[in-house]
UniProtKB/Swiss-Prot annotation:
Belongs to the MnmG family. This is tRNA uridine 5-carboxymethylaminomethyl modification enzyme MnmG. NAD(+) binds at residues 273-287. The gene is mnmG. It holds the Pfam family GIDA. Residues 204-226 are annotated as: Disordered. NAD-binding protein involved in the addition of a carboxymethylaminomethyl (cmnm) group at the wobble position (U34) of certain tRNAs, forming tRNA-cmnm(5)s(2)U34.
Length: 625
């Protein structure tokens, strides 16, 4: 009889992080996947990170997750997006060697302490009914093997009753030539989970040797490339270029003439696709005034002959894809290695989850990744690590849930959005979703999260020591700059003019001036050069934003106060005077854990919040008396 503390179903980005996190904390963990060879597979684009997404990768890394370390072993074109803007919206991104990424992830997972991997298909799970809610008991594989578990994490990606479409052709699959998961979808439905359908897509893969790159815009990465992981010193792989081309009026004419053949225009038109990553058919239809759309030709590896054309996701028939591609500059003689396609799949309403990502209907069942309505490797990884941590912690009946708030991390923003607001289309993170993005930056994810993770045993002692060394260095340099006084005359000697009022200013305060940076200050104070480049950058960013932090602090304190005003799980909202029936039903369904969460539920009025607060205070005072 096989027994585990935690079982994770799915070996994608979410499943890998969930399994590793649970195992790291000490849970006896089993990862079940259709195929060990596809663990860590990059199903769509061969890249990690981007705007907001790159910050999530660093947050996962700060919690000792895998994604940051793995991409650093596969990065072949690294860049910081939005570099010309403020550090709060910088987006680390790395083009990956697809094979190296998969192999590095598999190497991590297959050698992880406390973690076992099983190649099987799970068709069902069972529960016990000896408590107020059904409680996870076991999973049953396709060959009827029963595996007992205390906690179960579903990270099924696009496999939950997935169907692939290419034109009028369709077949059950979660990924090209990989079977979908039908049994689990039926099991979830039997427990009355609210299931919906979403879709996503991928472009055709192209033969590199059939592309004419001359005349196309070359896109080199940063020199030197920046690593994602706080534990990585550098990127050691050769860096190669991507190339930029674009569609044109001829391309759009081919697409318009064949719109009726695209699956997304017919069979799938009622199923929502990612709003911010539309297919080329949807781009042409929605933005009819535009004559071109960018297409990024991204290599799939150092030794790969395959090119990923980012920007032309399609569900048109293969012959239409071929005709369309040949109208694009550089692709006149292109050969398709694999057709683009669209995939539709089941997801559950994420409002049926707590902030821990445990379901409200079944105790011990957690969901993470695309099953919760998100899109993207990074969003999946962020959910996976939270689900894994909480599943492992909850093995102790007196555990404190590990919940990241909106002021803690982009992961916290995402999960709060999902479980509070739900989603009717694939959810993607953006910096605009975060109220406190000045604090939620890519440079300080370790300062924000590593200690929190260490306290619950999700972070290794080695990483914790690395964090403390960094904090010491940052504090030392910050104190030096705050104690160092500079006169306007000293700055003028280095070509920097500020108000000649004779007023003494600290070097730290001067950094808030947009015309002054660490390069200038290091010419005046040589000791700055003794610090690591990352420390210098960290202190400079903190100094630049310091005046804004002061203004934002009141907002954050108000937010924290509301988040810390807990609402008992067993509260009966029907007993609160002044709440409409509609609001009572919403609150009873959502079961918000705090006043802050209740306030963010659509339709819950300020007056309702006041009534809830009055009720909580009244009963608190009653208990005291």
């Amino acid at each position: 009889m096989k027994k585990y503390d935690v079982v994770v179903i799915g070996g994608g980005h979410s499943g890998c992080e969930a399994a590793a996190a649970a195992a790291r904390i000490g849970a006896k963990t089993l990862l079940i996947t259709h195929s060990i060879s596809t663990i860590g597979e990059m199903s769509c684009n061969p890249a990690i990170g981007g705007i907001a997404k790159g910050i999530v990768v660093r947050e996962v890394d700060a919690l000792d997750g895998l994604m940051g370390k793995v991409i650093d072993n596969a990065s072949i074109n690294s860049t910081i997006l939005n570099r010309s803007k403020g550090p709060a919206v910088w987006g680390p991104r790395a083009q990956a060697d697809r094979d190296l990424y998969r192999h590095a992830m598999q190497n991590s997972i297959l050698n992880y302490p406390n973690l076992t991997v099983l190649e099987a298909s799970v068709e069902n799970f069972t529960t016990t009914d000896n408590q107020e809610l059904p409680t996870i008991n076991s999973v049953i594989t396709a060959d009827q093997e029963v595996i007992y578990t205390k906690k179960l994490i579903l990270t099924t990606g696009t496999f939950l009753q997935g169907t692939i479409h290419i034109g009028s052709y369709n077949t059950p699959a979660g990924r090209f030539n990989e079977q979908s998961s039908v049994g689990l979808a039926k099991t979830l439905a039997s427990y009355n989970f609210k299931l919906g359908r979403l879709r996503t897509g991928t472009p055709p893969r192209l033969d590199r040797n059939s592309i004419n790159f001359s005349g196309l815009q070359e896109q080199k990465g940063d020199t030197p490339p920046s690593p994602f992981s706080y534990m990585s010193e550098s990127i050691n792989l050769p860096q190669i270029s991507c190339y930029l081309t674009a569609t044109n009026t001829k391309t759009h004419e081919v697409i318009k003439n064949n719109l009726h053949k695209a699956a997304a225009s017919n069979l799938l038109k009622e199923i929502k696709a990612p709003r911010y990553c539309p297919s080329i058919e949807e781009k042409v239809r929605r933005f009819s005034e535009r004559n071109s759309h960018q297409v990024f030709l991204e290599p799939e590896g150092l030794n790969s002959e395959i090119i990923y054309p980012n920007g032309i996701t399609t569900s048109s028939p293969l012959d239409v894809q071929q005709t369309m591609l040949k109208t694009i500059s550089g692709l006149e003689n292109v050969k398709i290695v694999r057709s683009g396609y669209s995939v539709e799949y089941n997801f559950i309403d994420p409002r049926e989850l707590y902030h821990t990502l445990e379901t409200k209907k079944i105790r011990g069942l957690y969901c993470a990744g695309q099953i919760n309505g998100t899109t993207g490797y990074e969003e999946a990884a962020g959910q996976g690590i939270i689900a894994g941590i909480n599943a492992a912690l909850s093995l102790n009946s007196n555990y404190e849930p590990f919940i990241l708030k909106r002021n803690d991390a982009y992961i916290g923003v995402m999960i709060d959005d999902l479980v509070t607001l739900g989603t009717s289309e694939p959810y993607r993170l953006f910096t605009s979703r975060a109220e406190y993005r000045l604090r939620l930056r890519s440079d300080n994810a370790d300062l924000r999260l590593t200690e929190l993770g260490y306290k619950v045993s999700a972070v290794s002692y080695q990483r914790y020591l690395t964090l403390n060394r960094k904090k010491e260095e940052v504090t030392k340099l910050t104190n030096i700059l705050k104690e160092t006084v500079i006169l306007p005359s000293q700055l003028s000697q280095h070509g920097v003019c500020i108000s000649q009022d004779g007023r003494k200013r600290s070097a730290f305060d001067l950094l808030s001036n947009p015309n002054i940076n660490m390069n200038i200050l290091s010419k005046i104070f040589n000791q700055i050069k003794n610090y690591h480049a990352s420390t210098i950058q960290q202190v400079e960013i903190e100094a630049k934003y310091a005046p804004y932090f002061i203004k934002q602090e009141l907002d954050i304190q108000s937010f924290i106060a509301e988040e810390n005003t807990h609402i008992p799980h067993d509260i009966e909202f029907s007993q609160i005077h002044g709440l409409s029936t509609e609001i009572q039903e919403k609150l009873q369904y959502m079961k918000p854990p705090s006043i802050g969460s209740a306030r963010r539920i659509p339709g819950v009025t300020p007056a309702a919040i006041t009534n809830i607060l009055f009720y909580l205070r009244y009963h608190k005072n009653k208990k005291i008396l």
